[in-house]
From Swiss-Prot:
It is a multi-pass membrane protein. This is Probable potassium transporter 9. Keywords: Glycoprotein, Ion transport, Membrane, Potassium, Potassium transport, Transmembrane, Transmembrane helix, Transport. Disulfide bonds: none annotated. Residues 43-59, 173-191, 237-264, 314-343, 413-422, 473-476 are extracellular. One of its GO terms (cellular component) is membrane. It comes from the Eukaryota. Belongs to the HAK/KUP transporter (TC 2.A.72.3) family. Residues 1-21, 81-151, 213-215, 286-292, 365-391, 444-451, 498-788 are cytoplasmic. NCBIfam families: kup. One of its GO terms (biological process) is potassium ion transport. The chain crosses the membrane at residues 22-42, 60-80, 152-172, 192-212, 216-236, 265-285, 293-313, 344-364, 392-412, 423-443, 452-472, 477-497. InterPro entries: K+_transporter, K_trans_C, K_trans_N.
Length: 788
């Protein structure tokens, strides 16, 4: 394969082999837990249809052939060889693909995009200059809003199915592992033991989420490794002991014989066979925690061979046993020697818990990403580890998943219905990944549309075959993921659509800068001590909630900052590039604008560190702004404009959380002075010990203003002094409290979606103050009525 295939044509950075080995070992417990336990239920789900296990072995060999080639074509070739290369700055998953497409084609529906976002280190596009920048597909996507909405809906469908998989995978994994008790208990005991034990394990699993997995996470990789070795050894034993000729079933001809003999029943049984791919998407979704080479190494050298040996061993045993009691069905444990059945049962339960933990964590992660892109209602995100980035816990989602998992276990009570439901969720996510990867091949890798079409048709046809086999089982369990997806889709679309309309309403009703500057003592307006942080989604202008605030209370803070916390279509924003700071009006007005940018995988800061970094960024901006004007005035001669700073109101400067880091201005740099040197100028204006690279974050930022310095302008000293005094006086957070209603004459559907649906979600989900981590004692809410 072309070594430059993917990755935006950039060469892949090589890692030390020891690091790769360590990451490959650690990935076993995070990435491959779900995939490694699939042999527990694949054969059992497949033969749950009207397929007889005849003495000719055509059925079992046909199923084994399907399993082998499915594992080879989808996880090995599609994911490991191709999809893993479509990473977004090392991150994978559905939103990573969508983010790549949004950056290479103007199809993002995020409302407050800026040209400055394209200068982010993680945003920049890399492709050969000889590649044409325009393509017909790109032009179609950018021209038609309907196609952009369809693309977002497809991403939402994939997200909903991942969340649905978070409900179904723990249930089927733990239930299949515990069902091994059926070989050691009587029928009555089995019926009354397996379900309660499964429910107890699920409750225990979800109850532990609050404490995080970092304390026991070191056990995950050894458990999965032990399970893979155990499965391989049992597979080799069964092959050698029962049928060494089972390898002949790897011939794809057995797939054709299987379908010829079983006809419609064989096609429907594909819904059980596809479960062998369960967990393949995790290789891509968890790419950011490891590396491409580590995941590739672990799968090709250990996971893939172990799975093949496990499935071949089961087939070898079943090929010599055709008169199995229907009570036992054709499960995994029937092929395990009785002398080691109990240890294998315990190890399988542990492995199923590890696999379930991985999918639960993945569900939390994708909901957090959806929330960042305004596609999911606000929820409380708790970070369970200070050292491990991205390890999060969402309380309301956790308990909802637990209730649904237990309901699925108690309601279905068998592997067949759980497998049908889980299979449809899994294959739908894979179809979405195939469609998005095809677009990435054309738009991001700038490959031929023919190559993208070949990729789409080849893998898409395989997945559509499995999808049809799963969908036909709608009444036998497949209805559940569809129902969950429809509910989640309605929630996500209503929230996203209304959020966009609210932004458009704010944009249309914002007030002018002249109105803000006209607020003065003559109108009875009072400037009170302190810093006022006015939160808004707007990146320019004065929001309507502030005008409503001063209309009802004719006073605002001496230092006023309009804060816009926004998400950009990149996984991470470097701390040195997070803040965009500029003035609103002349310097004497003491009003600023600060745009805080986060990636869809970034962690929002707690209020103490955020407040400290924000004030620090303002101080650094004041220095750089003064230096800019000093150099500009020197370059333009003796002529000096009194309103020069007013002219730069629309100019925003990148201010990092560490002044020693690189700072950039989005205006042309014609002053010839390094911004790093400016941030470190020896005039003694600002001293910010809290931002030192190696120092811990403190809750206060102090400024030392040396008025005696001859290089310091008097106005800069006064401005910094006022900022220092305002910081000591305290900070108030001013947020809008929205009330949404529809316009008179709106359609019934709009009234239900916006007036009922959105308002219900808004009242019952977390408020913006919780998401922004605003302290209640410093919160001021301004009522805003949105007529949409």
């Amino acid at each position: 394969m072309d070594p430059e295939f993917g990755r935006g044509m950039a060469p892949r950075k090589r890692e030390p082999w020891r690091t790769t080995l360590l990451l490959a070992y650690q990935s076993l417990g995070v990435v491959y837990g779900d995939l490694s336990i699939s042999p527990l239920y694949v054969y059992k789900s497949t033969f749950a249809e009207d397929i007889t296990h005849s003495e000719s072995n055509e059925e079992i060999f046909g199923v084994l052939s399907f399993v082998f080639w499915t594992l080879t074509l989808i996880p090995l070739i599609k994911y490991v060889s191709i999809v893993l290369r479509a990473d977004d700055n090392g991150e994978g998953g559905t939103f990573a693909l969508y983010s790549l497409i949004c950056r290479h084609a103007n199809v993002s529906l995020l409302p407050n995009r800026q040209v400055a976002d394209e200068e982010l280190s993680t945003y920049k596009l890399e492709y050969p200059p000889e590649v044409a920048n325009r393509s017909r597909i790109k032009e179609w996507l950018e021209k038609h809003k309907t196609l952009q909405t369809a693309l977002l809906i497809m991403v939402m469908i994939g997200t909903c199915m991942v969340i649905g998989d978070g409900v179904l995978t723990p249930a089927i994994s733990v239930f299949s592992a515990v069902s091994g008790l059926e070989l050691s208990l009587s029928r009555d005991q089995h019926e009354y033991a397996v379900i309660p034990i499964t429910c107890v394990i699920l409750v225990f699993l979800f109850a532990l989420q609050h404490y995080g997995t970092h304390r026991v996470g070191f056990l995950f990789a050894p458990i999965v490794l032990a399970w893979l070795i155990c499965m391989s050894m049992l597979g080799l034993y069964n092959i050698i002991h029962w049928n060494p000729q089972v390898y002949r079933a790897l011939n794809p001809y057995y797939m054709l014989k299987f379908l010829r003999k079983t006809k419609k029943s064989g096609w429907m049984s594909l819904g059980g066979i596809l479960l062998c791919m369960t967990g393949s998407e995790a290789m891509f979704a968890d790419l950011g925690h490891f590396s491409y080479s580590a995941i590739q190494l672990a799968f090709t050298t250990l996971v893939y061979p172990a799975l093949i040996l496990g499935y071949m061993g089961q087939a070898a045993y079943l090929s010599k046993h055709h008169t199995l009691n229907s009570t036992y069905q054709i499960g995994y444990y029937i092929s395990v020697p009785e002398s080691v059945r109990w240890p294998v049962l315990v190890l399988a339960i542990l492995a199923s818990v590890v696999g379930s933990q991985a999918i639960i964590s993945g569900t939390f992660s994708i909901i957090n990403q959806s929330q960042s892109l305004s596609c999911f209602p606000r929820v409380k995100v708790v970070h369970t580890s200070e050292n491990i980035h991205g390890q999060i816990y969402i309380p309301e989602i956790n308990w909802l998943l637990m209730v649904l998992c237990i309901a699925v276990t108690v309601g279905f009570r068998d592997t067949k219905h759980m497998g049908n439901a889980s299979g449809l969720a899994v294959i739908t996510v894979m179809l979405v990944t195939t469609c998005l990867t095809s677009l990435v091949i054309m738009l991001c890798w700038h490959r031929s549309p023919a190559l993208a079409l070949v990729f789409f048709l080849f893998f898409g046809s395989i997945e559509v075959l499995y999808f049809s086999a799963s969908l036909i089982k709608f009444r036998e369990g497949a209805w559940l993921p569809i129902m969950l997806a429809l509910i989640l889709m309605a929630v996500m679309f209503i929230w996203h659509h209304t959020t966009i309309k609210k932004y458009e309403f704010d944009l249309h009703n914002k007030v002018t800068l002249e109105w803000l500057l006209a607020l003065g003592d003559k109108l009875g307006m009072v400037r009170v001590p302190g810093i006022g942080l006015v939160y808004t989604d707007l990146t320019s202008g004065v929001p309507a909630n502030f005008s409503r605030f001063v209309t009802n209370l004719p006073a605002f803070h001496r230092v006023l900052v309009f804060v816009c916390v926004k998400s950009v279509p990149v996984p991470h924003v470097l701390p040195a590039e997070r803040y965009l700071v500029g003035r609103v009006g002349p310097a004497g007005h003491r009003s600023y604008r600060c745009i805080v940018r986060y990636g869809y995988r970034d962690v929002h800061q707690d209020v103490d560190s955020f407040e400290a970094e924000l004030v620090e960024s303002l101080a650094t901006f004041i220095k750089l702004d003064a230096l800019y004007h000093r150099c500009s005035d020197a370059g333009s001669g003796s002529e000096q404009l009194d309103d020069g700073r007013y002219e730069r109101e629309n100019a925003l400067t990148v201010i990092g959380t560490n002044p020693l880091r690189r700072c950039l201005s989005y205006e042309a740099s014609h002053d010839g002075v390094s911004s790093v040197d400016a941030a470190r100028s020896p005039n003694g204006i600002v001293e910010v010990p809290a931002a030192a690279a190696a120092a811990p974050v403190t809750k206060k930022v102090r400024f030392v203003v040396e008025a005696a310095s001859p290089e310091v302008e008097k106005g800069v000293v006064e401005e910094l002094q006022e900022l220092c005094e305002a910081r000591e006086a305290g900070t108030a957070f001013i947020l809008g409290h929205s009330h949404v209603q529809t316009k008179p004459g709106s359609s019934l559907l709009k009234k239900l979606a916006v007036g009922v649906g959105y308002n219900f979600l808004r009242r019952n989900c977390r408020g913006p103050d919780v998401v922004l981590r605003v302290p209640p004692a410093s919160l001021l809410e301004v009522g805003m009525v949105y007529v949409l």
